[in-house]
Amino acid sequence: MKSMIVVACLALACGAHASGWAGPPANIALSQDGRNILDTPEVAQARAAHISALQQASKNNPNPNDDGSYDPRWDNEEYWQQAEGKWNGAPAPAWNAAPAPSWNGAHAAAPSWNAAPAHSWNAAGSAPAPVAETPEVAQARAAHLAALSAAKSAAPAQQQWNAPAHQDWNAPAHQDWNAPAHQDWNAPAHQSWNGAPSWQSGAPAHQPANIRLANDGSGILDTPEVAAARAAHLAAHAQAAHSAPAHAPQQHW
């Protein structure tokens, strides 16, 4: 039985003939590296026509995001009749239409506190802009500078605190502080530092002193009273030094 089945299979196999392409072999062209099969002239022509049609359609397409692929929603009629405007519907108002009235615009009933365009505090650059002075500050500054300038220009140079060297406070060694008794610091009233009438004496009270600054503004000049007292004091010292003996023995306290 088994042998008969085997014989029948062999007979069927021998009687069967191959089925498939019976035409001439296709003209297959390979790429230069032999890895890819090139398009036939018919396929290349069809591909070029397809690409040209896509390019032409993309030029006429108002929606650049549409790549031409099929969208199943297009089968629904409601998709084309929706309330919101579609690409083929009535044009909807643009989001950047006419600007709405601003709350601080010119047509407001009362002038807005910031209706005028405010300058940015750093509009000039990265650094903050300087703060402008108020009219009161500017006026006070101008008056102050004018007063300083007037005081400097009116101050005489010979009335400075630093007198010439020959009128120095430090007298030479032979004019020592410890002079003879008759040349003592406490000299007669007409040669004393306190000999000149004081402004606090019984004389009528003077007005407040007119304070004047030095040329560079760093010091206060002597008043006429102080300058006169200083000159009298220096003159008394010079007179005492001139009248003292050259080698008189010094008297110590």
Curated annotation (Swiss-Prot):
Coiled-coil stretches noted in the UniProt entry, renumbered to this chain: none
Stretches with biased composition (Polar residues): 54-66, 189-201
Sequence repeat ranges, renumbered to this chain: 97-100, 115-118, 154-157
Keywords assigned: Cuticle, Repeat, Signal
Annotated signal sequence range: 1-18
GO MF: structural constituent of cuticle
Keyword Repeat (UniProt): yes
Bias (Low complexity) ranges: 155-167
Domain of life of the native organism: Eukaryota
Region (Disordered): 54-74, 155-178, 187-206
Written domain comment of the UniProt record: The tetrapeptide (A-A-P-[AV]) repeats found throughout the protein are also present in many proteins constituting the protective envelope of other species.
Record's function text: Component of the cuticle of the pupae of silk moth.
Protein name: Pupal cuticle protein
Organism per entry: Bombyx mori
Gene name, Swiss-Prot/TrEMBL: PCP
